[in-house]
A protein has these predicted regions:
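Short beta->alpha connector loops at strand-helix junctions that form conserved
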Residues: 58, 77-82
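A short helix->loop->beta-strand "cap" motif at the edges of active sites that frequently abuts
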Residues: 52, 73, 133-137, 165-166
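Active-site PLP attachment segment
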Residues: 160-184
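Conserved PLP-anchoring active-site segment centered on the Schiff-base-forming lysine
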Residues: 46-68
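Short acidic capping loops at alpha-helix termini that bridge into adjacent secondary structure
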Residues: 25-30, 50-53, 165-168
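Active-site phosphate-binding strand-loop segment of PLP-dependent enzymes
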Residues: 81-152
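N-terminal small-domain helix-loop-helix segment of the aminotransferase-like
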Residues: 1-35, 42
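A short helix-loop-beta submotif of the ANL/AMP-binding
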Residues: 70-76
Length: 184
């Protein structure tokens, strides 16, 4: 396959996120991968050792589970709470999960798949502060960031604060929003 990523790629990504989401990304922050799932797996491998714990908010995209298990890590479920018309984060339970010294990573699905929930800046900030306090790195799968209904606004997790930016990894891809997964 091709190993060189053209300069235009980096310009397209940085320009898109600046225009669409008000997030100014430095080119040096971008690492091209073949997709979000391989990126998530590689990040888990880089940030954990076998036996560490990875927090997920269930229900969640099933590939998260294999990415965690394939790296020898333990899955820690922080179930979302179902209300009459949506899902909500259980922050008290998240605090308990993150307080475990073996918890090293939290996989955040933003917007959430399969719940379709677009997290608010306040919810993301609360989640981020819990993870920061406990030394847990947030790995944000934001592949669905362009698939947001009118009236809702996607917020990139890492854009909320410098502390979050420096203690997180954001994974994105145009494959879902633009139906181009076959181009990989």
């Amino acid at each position: 396959g091709y190993t060189r990523v053209p300069d235009a790629y980096y310009g397209a990504v940085t320009s898109w996120f600046s225009r669409r989401h008000g997030w100014d990304i430095d080119r040096e922050w971008i690492i091209y991968t073949s997709g979000v799932v391989p990126a998530v797996s590689a990040v888990i491998k880089a940030l954990t050792v076998p036996g560490d714990k990875v927090i997920v908010q269930t229900p969640v995209y099933n590939c998260f589970f294999s990415s965690i298990r394939n790296n020898g890590c333990e899955i820690v479920s922080n179930p979302l709470r179902r209300t009459a018309d949506t899902y909500e984060m259980d922050f008290d339970a998240l605090e308990r999960c993150a307080a475990d010294p073996r918890a090293k990573v939290m996989l955040l699905c933003n917007p959430h798949n399969p719940a379709g929930r677009v997290w608010t800046p306040d919810e993301l900030t609360r989640l981020g502060n819990i993870c920061l306090r406990n030394g847990v790195t947030v790995v944000a799968d934001e592949i669905h960031c362009e698939l947001v209904y009118q009236g809702f606004k996607y917020t990139p997790f890492a854009s909320l604060s410098d502390a979050f930016l420096h203690r997180s990894v954001t994974c994105v891809s145009p494959s879902k929003a633009f139906n181009i997964a076959g181009l990989q």
